[in-house]
């Protein structure tokens, strides 16, 4: 069942017996933003119709930022774009991006645990 078949987060929590907890999640770290990323993003914002579609936003804004943040951790994590995942027959889908443990078997092998990264939508 695609992620969208669940009507609420509560439905997922009940179905999979997951405990919901809210807390502050803040890891303080110094990240130096590469100059080329700033240059590329400024170019995109000025010259590309980046907000005409979900795909355009993903390709022109979200992915370059994720890739830049991920690059220093390339030996530890893998970055996946629009990779189908399936927990079981009831919970499956295609998140915009996934970050997973880097597999010892190579870059094409998906490992868990993973973090799903999705863009917020108005719907």
Model-derived regions, located:
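A short, conserved, highly charged catalytic patch centered on acidic carboxylates
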Residues: 2-4, 9-123
